[in-house]
Amino acid sequence: MAAAVLGQLGALWIHNLRSRGRLAWGVLPQSYVHTSASLDISRKWEKKNKIVYPPQLPGEPRRPAEIYHCRRQIKYSKDKMWYLAKLIRGMSIDQALAQLEFNDKKGAKIIKEVLLEAQDMAVRDHNVEFRSNLYIAESTSGRGQYLKRIRYHGRGRFGIMERVYCHYFVKLVEGPPPPPEPPKMAVAHAKEYIQQLRSRTIIHTL
């Protein structure tokens, strides 16, 4: 008796769903479907190429072109990639390619490929006249999506290891590279520290 009642209730529930509208996988929210790989990548870095600035006034200096490019899910450590990314930061595009050409690390070849792709993108999509008139304004690495795998041990035992991946991001700006900033001396650091102490305020007071 109870099974018959439950069967009738289930049939009524399905009938109500069908009367409201047919459900399809395409209209279900993405959170109900296992799409973790697609949800992790927001593509915010590449969207910066689509920023439209307001028109410039007559006589105003021309705004330099900015090119954002990246490569994701590189089979390489983010810490090893960071050292190479920091190496070319602030260099011209030709100088950076020359430095990476004579570096025997695996990440150097990857960064060189990304820089060449960004250089072609600058000429093709961003109206840059000279390929060499670019410098690396930003260059950094980020943590990718790690994958857990089984590491087999002796005597039938095992452990969990991670296959590491990283992202590499670069921003090219049209024009000559800016002069390097001189390193701060101890006196300058001390003055900044004293100024921070003097500018402190007492919270929850007038």
UniProtKB/Swiss-Prot annotation:
Here the transit peptide covers: 1-40
The record's annotation in InterPro entries points to: Ribosomal_uL22, Ribosomal_uL22_bac/org-type, Ribosomal_uL22_sf
Q: Which GO terms describe its molecular function?
A: structural constituent of ribosome
Subcellular location per the Swiss-Prot or TrEMBL entry = Mitochondrion
- What UniProt keywords are attached to this protein's entry? Mitochondrion, Ribonucleoprotein, Ribosomal protein, Transit peptide
Q: Name one GO cellular component term.
A: mitochondrion
- This protein's superkingdom? Eukaryota
Q: Does the keyword Manganese apply?
A: no
One biological process term in Gene Ontology: translation
| Main location (coarse class) | mitochondrion
Pfam families reported in the protein's UniProt record: Ribosomal_L22
Fill in the subunit field for this protein.
Component of the mitochondrial ribosome large subunit (39S) which comprises a 16S rRNA and about 50 distinct proteins.
Q: Which family does it belong to?
A: Belongs to the universal ribosomal protein uL22 family.
Q: What is this protein called?
A: Large ribosomal subunit protein uL22m
Q: Which gene encodes it?
A: MRPL22
